[in-house]
Amino acid sequence: IAQTPPPYQPGMGDLMVTIVQPRHLKLGLAGQARNWDYADYAQHELEEALETVEKHIPKWRNLDIGQLMAATVKQPLEEVEKAVKAKNAVAFDAAYRQVTEACNACHRSANLPAIVIKVPDASAFPNQEFRVTRP
């Protein structure tokens, strides 16, 4: 009798490239387009993605992921949320750069300085419009 394989357990890299990095990218693109409604959605989705990582991988390479995220990305994400709610482009750009740098600080803390995240300059989603449009 064939045994059912164990359920798939994504690793840290899997979660980062499949749920966190795309959310970071979409938030950046929405903010650059000043699409505040979508940026609000994307910001919350990025927070949820980070919470998913923390839930599924609370410890990684002797690092407490929750503590590391709280120390690096929590405050910048709060600043992004404030900027989006205020529809403040200058504040958004600054806060988003802080989130991006927080991602890189987290990578350095995990001894992975080669993983460098940047403010997007292109979309990986050619089938999605980030500018404000109404049907």
Indicate where each model-derived feature is located.
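Sequence context surrounding c-type heme c attachment/ligation sites in exported
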Residues: 5-135
